Structure formats: structure tokens, C-alpha cells
Curated annotation (Swiss-Prot):
Domain EF-hand positions: 109-144
GO cellular component: cytoplasm; plasma membrane
Stretches the record annotates as Disordered: 166-224, 243-315, 346-367, 388-409
Basic and acidic residues composition-biased segments: 171-185, 193-224
UniProt entry tagged with the keyword Cytoplasm: yes
Keyword Transcription regulation carried by entry: no
Family: Belongs to the NKD family.
InterPro entries xref list: EF-hand-dom_pair, EF_Hand_1_Ca_BS, EF_hand_dom, Nkd-like
Function of the molecule: Cell autonomous antagonist of both the canonical and non-canonical Wnt signaling pathways.
Protein name: Protein naked cuticle homolog 2-like
Length: 409
């Protein structure tokens, strides 16, 4: 090979500065000659205008001619067009072909469209579809379509476009749709029911806890304090309450716990009629003897409702008031069968005081004083028994209404 066709020689130098690239001197000389020849031609015409034919070697066309684009489906229609037809054929072409909707290698004529429908029986009977099943299915569909497809214009290119959509049968589709609608409606109905159940359970639990706390905190108050308070103030004003007089007593008095029995039993028995209370009071007063005139003065007539009220009056006998806050609680000496019957009856009444006597206590005490003034009494022990009975009612009355008794004198 000559020097012109020889490659660049890379020689390694022995100095520590590194390698050097040695270029063939003949190639550099040829490039310098070409530069001088073309440079002289440009220098000659630097200050003059270029004329036609001077630079023929450098003249080249800058326009690129491209072949016309043709659609595959419309070749048979376009090749038979002649320029003699004129505007009539141009309008037909515009009607048949829309350049905006045109796609490469796709025919838009409706006659060339073909449709295949594949019905698959028990395709997902097992409920699982793998990639192998899908690939074998696609290969089968492609083979069937390729064998039965009809290409227009008998062209060499074969481009096949397949659209696969898997849909159930119409009957199965309706059945699935109704089933899903029923399930969704059922679920939408079940959720509010569950939420209502949770809300009602929360309400029951909260009311149960609230009832327990109220029972532990305020077990010494009456069940219906507002009604008792209203009746008491109506009695103080001189207005009789006829609604609480004729109400029936509730049967749940015996089912209360023992810790609340002494205080909550006044509510069920507070709705007894006034006639029974008046008969009990008359039964206790008739067989009694006249008390000592010293006992009828002071606290027996005024009846202070505060627990310290009876000790404020100086006319009370010491043996009556030394064993209690108010009047004496000493045991009476039974003198006969009637007195024993009175003590037993008095014990039963002491454990079941009536709230109606609290609400109408002033009118009842006035009637009792009239009966004591008219009836001659001979036994002093019965007097203490009557005083004990009277005091027990006032003592219970203090427990129920102690929040407004301090305003009275």
C-alpha cells in the first residue's frame, strides 16, 4: 500500500511527558493545496458581484422532491382519476376522504370493514385465567382472522387491526346487574341499621352509667323532687293540689334497695287519698288521754321544721327532748291490748310515711288539734306515742325538703 492509503501511525515516545500523535505529512500538504486553490477564488470576487456561471461547481438545488403520499384503501379509486373529469371528481374525492380523519394504512370506507364475533363457552369455568390461556386465545383469534380477512386493492402490505372485548351474555349481564344492584342496595340498607344499633346501644349504655352515678350521688332525694317541691310551695301559698291527691300508688315500693328504702318509700305512699290519712290520725287520737297542759304549749303547737327547732323553746319537758334532736323517742309503756295495737300500728306507719301528709300537713294538723281539743283523753303514755308519730313524719319531711326549710323560722 502506498503512502496515500496508509493509516496514521501512533508511535509511543520514550519521554515521561506522554504519547504523541504523528500525522503523515503528505495528507497535510494536500489539504493545504486545496485550501489555497479555493481561497484564491473567493478572494478574487470579494469586492465584486457574483455573476452567473462563475461558480458552477458550487451551485446545487436546495429543494427536496418527495413522492406523493397514498392511502392503501384508496389506491384503486385514485389511480383511475383523470384530469379531464375536473371539479366533479374533486368534489367526490372530498366527500370520500377526510384528511383530518385519515390514518396511515387504514381504510375509512364502510364496505371494507369486517367484524368477527367469537363466543367462548365456559372460558372461566374454573374461575382462574392464566397468561397461557390468554396467549392461546389470541393466537387462535389471529389465525382465524388472518385466514378470513379480505384485503382491498390486492396490495402487498397486510396490516391487521384486531379489537378484543370480553363481555358476558345478555341474560347473564342482566342477572349480574340486578344481583349487584340488590347487593349494593342491601348493603346500603344494612349500614344505617348497624349505625342505628350502635347508636341505640351507646345511648342505653350512657343512660345506664348516668343512672348509676345519679343513684350513687343523690340516693337520699325523692324520685320526683320537682313535683314535691311544687306541691309544698302550693300548700304554703294556700292552694290545694288535687292532682297528687287522687293518684294511684305505684307497686314498686318494695323492690327498692335497702340503702334507699328509708328515704324513697315516701314517694309510692305519698299518693294515697286523704281519707285514709285522716282515718289513721283519728284512730290514734280518739283513745288517747288529755296531755299535760305544759306539753300543749310551745313546740307542739308551732312545730318547727328544722332539726334544731324544738330545742329553742323553753317550755319543753327535759325527759321528752334529751334522746333526740326534736321530740323524745322513748318507748311508751303498753297499758292494755289497745295500746299494744296502737304501738304496732304506729311502727308500721313510722316506716311508711306518706308524702301527702307532708304536702297537706298544715290542714291535717289543724284538724288534729281540733279533735284533741274536743276529745277527752286520759292516758299520758298515748300522748308520747302521738308525739312520736307526729315527730317521725316531720323528721322524714325534713329529709326530703331540707333545701328550702332554712328560710322558715
Amino acid at each position: 500500500m502506498g503512502k496515500l492509503h496508509s493509516k496514521h501511525a501512533c508511535k509511543r515516545r520514550e519521554n515521561p511527558e506522554g504519547d504523541s500523535f504523528v500525522v503523515n505529512g503528505f495528507i497535510a500538504k494536500r489539504a493545504a493545496e486545496e485550501d489555497e486553490r479555493y481561497g484564491n477564488n473567493l478572494k478574487d470576487y470579494k469586492n465584486e458581484e457574483l455573476k452567473d456561471g462563475r461558480l458552477t461547481l458550487l451551485h446545487c438545488p436546495l429543494q427536496v422532491v418527495l413522492p406523493p403520499e397514498k392511502a392503501e384503501g384508496c389506491e384503486s379509486f385514485l389511480q383511475y382519476l383523470s384530469p379531464d373529469d375536473g371539479e366533479r371528481d374533486a368534489q367526490k374525492v372530498k366527500k370520500r376522504i377526510s384528511l383530518q380523519d385519515l390514518e396511515c394504512n387504514v381504510s375509512l370506507a364502510e364496505d371494507n370493514r369486517q367484524e368477527w364475533v367469537f363466543t367462548l363457552y365456559d372460558f372461566d369455568n374454573s374461575g382462574k385465567v392464566t397468561k397461557e390461556d390468554m396467549s392461546s386465545l389470541m393466537h387462535t383469534i389471529y389465525d382465524v382472522v388472518d385466514a378470513s380477512v379480505k384485503h382491498s386493492c390486492n396490495t402487498k402490505r397486510r396490516s391487521l387491526r384486531v379489537k378484543l372485548s370480553v363481555t358476558p351474555e345478555p341474560a347473564a349481564r342482566r342477572r349480574d346487574a340486578t344481583h349487584t344492584e340488590r347487593e349494593t342496595s342491601h348493603l346500603s340498607q344494612v349500614e344505617p341499621v348497624r349505625s342505628e344499633e350502635h347508636r341505640s346501644a351507646d345511648r342505653r349504655q350512657s343512660t345506664h352509667i348516668r343512672g348509676q352515678t345519679e343513684a350513687h350521688e343523690g340516693n337520699h332525694y325523692c324520685v320526683d323532687e320537682n313535683t314535691e317541691r311544687r306541691n309544698h310551695y302550693l300548700d304554703l301559698a294556700g292552694i290545694e293540689n288535687y292532682t297528687s291527691r287522687f293518684d294511684s300508688s305505684s307497686p314498686d315500693a318494695d323492690q327498692d334497695p335497702p340503702s334507699r328504702s328509708s328515704h324513697s318509700q315516701s314517694r309510692p305512699h305519698s299518693q294515697e287519698p286523704e281519707t285514709h290519712v285522716y282515718q289513721r290520725r283519728s284512730q290514734l287520737i280518739e283513745p288517747c288521754v288529755a296531755p299535760d297542759p305544759r306539753l300543749r304549749t310551745g313546740p307542739q303547737l308551732i312545730r318547727s321544721r328544722s332539726p334544731k327547732g324544738s330545742s329553742r323553746f323553753p317550755g319543753v319537758i327535759p325527759n321528752v327532748t334529751k334522746t333526740s334532736k326534736c321530740h323524745g323517742h322513748h318507748q311508751p309503756i303498753p297499758t292494755g291490748q289497745d295500746v299494744y295495737h296502737l304501738t304496732q300500728q304506729n311502727h308500721t306507719h313510722a316506716h311508711t310515711p306518706s308524702g301527702l301528709q307532708h304536702s297537706h300537713s298544715r290542714r291535717i294538723r289543724s284538724r288534729a288539734r281540733e279533735q284533741q281539743a274536743l276529745t277527752p283523753v286520759k292516758n299520758t303514755n298515748a300522748t308520747a306515742l302521738v308525739q312520736r308519730h307526729e315527730h317521725h313524719h316531720h323528721h322524714e319531711h325534713h329529709h326530703h325538703h331540707h333545701y328550702h326549710h332554712y328560710h322558715q323560722t
